[in-house]
Amino acid sequence: MGVIAKQSIKGAIANYVGVLIGAITTFFVVTDLLTQEEIGLTRVMVDAAMLFAGLAQLGTNASILKFYPLFKDPESHDHGFFGWTLILPFIGFIIIGVLFFVFKNGVADYYSANSPLIVNYVYLLLPLTFFALYMTVFETNASVLLHIAVPKFVREVLIRILNLVSYLLYGYGMVSLDVFVVLFCSSYAVATVVNFCYLMTLGKISFRLDWQFVDKRLLRQVLVYTLFMTAAVLAGNIKLFNSIFLAKEGLKLAGIYTIACYIANVIEIPYRSLGAISSPIISQAVQDGNMAEVNRLGRQVSTHQLLVASMLLFFIWINLGPLFAIIPNGEEYVSGMGVVLFLGLANLLNSTLCIATNILNFSKHYAFSLLFISLLTASAILLNLWLIPRWGVSGSACATLFAYVVYFVPLLTLLWSKLRVSLFSAKQLQIVMLTLLLFGLNGLWNFFLSPLFSMAGTGMGVVLVEALLRTGLFGILAIAALRKMHISPEVDKILKIEN
């Protein structure tokens, strides 16, 4: 756990530096310099590329995490494991490329009526997909080598800095829209190159394929698992459907969703680091048949994620009003408050229970993943098609939340019945009760105290003073409650509680 903690902390620092840069960019640059349609365009381009890249992986990322323990051998550079991880994604990219050209005209027709900007730049999707694909593959290779901090910095910080530069260049009229979109997409090319160079500096990878080590039995096992897990990438990417379907109704809706989604996605940030560094450890425990360790790690990750996600959701929610009052053109995006709530709940559920997906994928029962992912994907698509016309931008967030519920209930049931693995504990119930109590107290604040602040005026100063007092008071209450609850030794240490 020492390595996990060390890399998680470094990764978390990169994540939150990226959040700071992203927050400044999103709330004070993008909303000021770009129209809602232009914001929606960048969102749809990235989401579509990430979805295509996920499918093009052909399950490679899951295979890296599952099979690396079998290949691990420092003396032979892991039997050329890195070289193997480059082949399947390239095959997948070729397949996606062929399908893209076959259905290109259909995609253009789908968006031409309400989102013609997408049609103008659809040609950039393939190169953007390629770089998004290998950026992720290189990042996963770094993860199994327990060197996740630098790739996290690249994903969370470097890309955001490069995007910020492109926003400023376009916003101040230094480049045209065409050049801006190319620069925006090029940030992923730079990130891919940096990740590759970093892997090479580790001195632990080799392009030489060890054909003698990979016998027919192992090759068959890897290929079957990899192809089976192709659909599994959709589990972590169902939110990508939201902007893609919203764009059908117009890029303006996708732009509103982008701003709200950025706020809600803060909730998932801790898991990006903790999940990436704990997954290889859990994979090793599953390979060793040490289910007691799997249970311990799974509950530990799940409990900590529930705590952090719940607190983040609460403090984001109570500060939404002041946030939209501060950002440029905030009145144009305030309709996204419902998205923040429902997508925030979806992110809380996913970050708390997502480790269950990894446990199943690493086990001998991974074949069930195809069933669950198919259920999740079908639910997400159908719910988006049904709810967006009825509830607009909030319907897309509700579709994600409901789809996750449909997905995790049978998944957790299977884990318990087949592996006797459970992610739940009494401490998690305490966290839920604390969160509900805080939301209830916030409701009382809105009813009794907010009118008193309104009597003092409606200016920005009054809004900020109330927000600071509310956040400070509830922060003190939350910390005091957590000190009494003793959620875990790690939480107690952070809160400076002596055992």
Descriptions of predicted regions:
Residues A23-E38, A108-Y111, L234-V266, I281-A285, ...:
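Helix-terminus/linker motif at the lipid-water interface of multi-pass membrane proteins
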Residues V29-L51, L117-V119, L177, V181-V182, ...:
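Interfacial/gating helices of multi-pass transporter permease domains
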Residues V3-A62, G92-F101, L128, V224-L251:
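Signature of the first transmembrane helix
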Residues M1-I4, G173, L177-L183, N195-L240, ...:
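Interhelical loop/hinge segments that connect adjacent transmembrane helices in multipass membrane
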